[in-house]
């Protein structure tokens, strides 16, 4: 049996401020740092180890992974970073407060942008100061590869491309893998692994910094999945609450 651990980054500063974040590189809040330490302690107490780790090129996911591995005394584990594991790009919504955006455009429209799988928010323009193409971390991307906005289908496409080319082969070779990423990135992976319908993924929420374990067969088909707490597996349908750590 193969085990895969997925973890959404701890609470970020813009999660705290209720802003659309996307590819904006904001850091963890103090609460997010605590959540990451707690996740590492949970994994260590439950006897988990890893051979390789994957994350995005955004510091909230990277820092979460660093803290988790540090808490587990696994700082030596190789870490691979790739933009294809970035959060969904929210286009011109990035940086905007979600409540204020709902007042401006209407709650229904904002809900469609956030939760439909194939509707993109308004795009950034290339002269927008929020346009990240010139950031050094993206220097290998061609102009046509760089998103100005994304729907969940767009996010899923790049995430699964990286899954099939890099992560799945490691799992099939017996490596113990952890992925520290973002809400919509993990939603994309869960949709694929569990073969969820479009309606099923719309209502799917991924909590910050709670380890989600997938037990997979030799063909990487899921046997079962569950969240972890200090007390072990959490009953199906339940999500453990964070403790101060």
Curated annotation (Swiss-Prot):
Disulfide bond entries: none
Keyword Isomerase appears in the UniProt entry: yes
Reactions listed under catalytic activity: (2R)-2-phosphoglycerate = (2R)-3-phosphoglycerate
Keyword entries, A-Z: Gluconeogenesis, Glycolysis, Isomerase
A GO biological-process term: glycolytic process
Sample GO molecular function, one term: phosphoglycerate mutase activity
Highest taxon of source: Bacteria
Residues involved in substrate binding: 8-15, 21-22, 60, 87-90, 98, 114-115, 183-184
Matches recorded under Pfam families: His_Phos_1 (PF00300)
Keyword Isomerase tagged: yes
Site (Transition state stabilizer): 182
Segments crossing the lipid bilayer: none
Active site positions, chain numbering: 9 (tele-phosphohistidine intermediate), 87 (proton donor/acceptor)
Documented EC number(s): 5.4.2.11
Name by which UniProt lists this protein: 2,3-bisphosphoglycerate-dependent phosphoglycerate mutase
Organism: Bacillus anthracis
Gene: gpmA
């Amino acid at each position: 049996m193969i085990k895969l651990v997925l973890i959404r980054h701890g609470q970020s500063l813009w999660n705290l401020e209720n802003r659309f974040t996307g590819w904006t590189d904001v850091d963890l809040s103090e609460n997010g740092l605590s959540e990451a330490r707690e996740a590492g302690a949970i994994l260590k107490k439950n006897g988990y180890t890893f051979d390789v780790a994957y994350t995005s090129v955004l510091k909230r996911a990277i820092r979460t992974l660093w803290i988790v591995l540090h808490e587990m005394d696994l700082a030596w584990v190789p870490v691979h970073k790739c933009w294809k594991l970035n959060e969904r790009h929210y286009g011109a919504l990035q940086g905007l407060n979600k409540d204020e955006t709902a007042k401006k455009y209407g709650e229904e429209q904002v809900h469609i942008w956030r939760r439909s799988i194939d509707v993109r928010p308004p795009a950034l323009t290339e002269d927008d100061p929020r346009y990240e193409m010139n950031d050094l971390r993206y220097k290998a991307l061609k102009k046509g590869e760089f998103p100005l906005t994304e729907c969940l289908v767009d996010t899923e496409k790049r995430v699964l491309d990286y899954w099939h080319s890099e992560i799945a082969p490691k799992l099939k070779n017996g490596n113990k893998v952890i992925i520290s990423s973002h809400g919509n990135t993990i939603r994309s992976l869960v949709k694929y692994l569990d073969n969820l319908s479009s309606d099923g993924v719309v209502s799917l929420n991924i909590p910050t910094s709670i380890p989600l374990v997938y037990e997979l067969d030799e063909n990487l088909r899921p046997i079962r999945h569950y969240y972890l707490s200090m007390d072990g597996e959490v009953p199906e349908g339940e999500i453990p609450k964070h403790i101060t750590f």
